[in-house]
Amino acid sequence: MDTEPLLSPLSPSPHLLHPLPEHAEVSTFSPPLSPCPSPASSYKERIIFGAHPPPPPPPPPPPPPPPRGRRYYRRVSGDDLDVPSCSSSPSPPSDEENPPPNPPSLFDFIGGRTNLHRSRTAPAMAPLNAAAIAAAAASGDSRNPPPPPRRPAIVLHAFLFLLAYLAMGVTFYAALPGNFTSSAGPTHPVADALYFCIVTLCTIGYGDITPATPAAKLFSISFVLIGFGFVDILLSGMVSYVLDLQEHLLITALKNPRSVRKHRHNYIFDLKKGRMRVRMKVALALTVVAICVGVGAAVLKRVENLGWLDAVYLAVMSVTTVGYGDHAFRTLAGRLFASAWLLVSTLAVARAFLYLAEMRIDKRHRAMANWVLSRDMTVSEFLAADIDNNGYVTKSEFVVYKLKEMGKISEKDIMMICDQFQRMDSGNCGKITLSDLLESHQLVTDLNEKKKGKKS
């Protein structure tokens, strides 16, 4: 009995090898908007958008018949596995029963996915319903957002408090003039009362008019505390507001292109930052102080009959709120002048001192900023600047770290901003979309309606 060997000693039968994807013929992809695309862009668009339907391939040549009495392998459709089919008298498979499959390619594999769509552009924002946008806009128009905090009428408030303060002091002094003693003698009850109130408010303390009874001393204690705690602060705010307003008007006038020789004032005004330079603020404040001292000395020499040295001495001691008490205003005209002059001069001196402190602080901040921006980043600073710990520092992270290092912002400010971002990022995806914004507006509207319903 003849046994057929399991392995043939002759040459093995040729296998059916499919061509690789890189050996397949690639048709040129030409998008409608680009007439002559490069091969690189063609490959990129084929990978992203998928392949066009390839032309029908030519019929492959029939495989050579295997030798008689030999085993052959045929492809069985199913799980894409080659299953050996044994037969004693095999017959070559016909092309009609088992047509050869088309050679697979990478583009066919990518193009067969259903989650990829052929799209030339990506949407700029999340697709939203037009009705939802219109409803959100209507709700935003119906509910008035809270207005930004505005500066109160500080000038009016300061003026009213000053009138109330002076009226209270003048009334008490004029009603009970015997409770106060004057070293220079009384002139007029109202003038002496107004002079006493202004000297007390400006914390000068000449000592020429003093309380003599316990009731007057109790009144003086409350009068000093009220004046020091409230009215003086309001007057300082009023002076700051008036000076800032004048500065804004000057800056606006200089920004007008019709103004002549506006570039010559850049030494005084910083037009880029929209403010007056600190040095010029100090110079102007000191000039105002010098004018106040000069005016006071001239009036003292004429009204109080003092020499120039004593007049300048008393003026300087008055505007700096020292008030030794060796000299004071003794005449009626002098006390009326002092009631207005002391109020303006002492506030001008205080503002000059604040500008001096601002100049020193600004100089220190500039030196710190130059030092921070001139040096390189170390490894520890890199790790500190990497906020999200992803191994690299973005431009925004670098800017935030440098601002923190220069003292422009603090960690508390950053945390407050991050908390606001987290509240607006309802999807917790690290970004704010228009849908998130509309959703937050809708939530705010619902909360307001619930509050109104509870109140009603």
UniProtKB/Swiss-Prot annotation:
PANTHER family associated with the record: POTASSIUM CHANNEL, SUBFAMILY K, TWO-PORE POTASSIUM CHANNEL 3
Role this protein plays: Inward-rectifying potassium channel.
Protein name: Two pore potassium channel c
Membrane topology of the entry: Multi-pass membrane protein
UniProt free text on domains: Each of the two pore-forming region (also called P-domain or P-loop) is enclosed by two transmembrane segments (2P/4TM) and contains the GYGD signature motif which seems to be involved in potassium selectivity.
InterPro entries attached to this UniProt entry: 2pore_dom_K_chnl, EF-hand-dom_pair, EF_Hand_1_Ca_BS, K_chnl_dom
Bias (Pro residues): 52-67
Family statement: Belongs to the two pore domain potassium channel (TC 1.A.1.7) family.
Start-end of intramembrane regions: 192-211, 310-329
GO cellular component terms, semicolon-separated: plant-type vacuole membrane; plasma membrane
